A protein has these predicted regions:
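Acetyl-CoA-dependent GNAT
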Residues: 1-35, 46-48, 52, 89, ...
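Residues forming the Rossmann-fold NAD(P)(H) cofactor-binding site
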Residues: 43, 70
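Conserved catalytic-core motifs of GNAT/GCN5-like acyltransferases
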Residues: 64-65, 80-97
Length: 105
């Protein structure tokens, strides 16, 4: 998915539909160009892809972010996702915990 401003891509989301294999949709990556951050675009994009994937009737959506990425944490929470667990030392360079979110339907 792409978030556009005219012909310019200013955000994107990559998802994986695990329905039939593991019965969830995974938010693999979601990014917004630095010039467009702190305007609610991450939540807008996350809400859009979540609503699009509802057509597949997944029991849950999953996603994660770095402990330091407060903006993405707010986007998850704004869209109804709840912190499911914190996984220490999940990311490297720099070493950081992952905040794992889930939205159950």
């Amino acid at each position: 998915y792409a978030l556009m401003d005219g012909e310019r891509i200013v955000g994107n989301a990559f998802i994986y539909n695990w329905i039939g294999e593991k019965d969830f949709v995974k938010i693999m990556n979601l990014a917004v160009h630095p010039e467009y951050r702190r305007r609610g675009f991450a939540a807008l994009l996350l809400d859009h892809v979540t609503n699009e994937m509802r057509a597949f009737n997944p029991p849950r959506f999953c996603g994660e972010t770095r402990a330091s990425n407060l903006g993405m944490q707010r986007a998850f929470e704004k869209c109804g996702y709840r912190l499911n667990r914190i996984e220490p030392d999940y990311y490297q360079n720099p070493n950081e915990s992952a905040y794992k979110y889930v939205l159950k339907l």
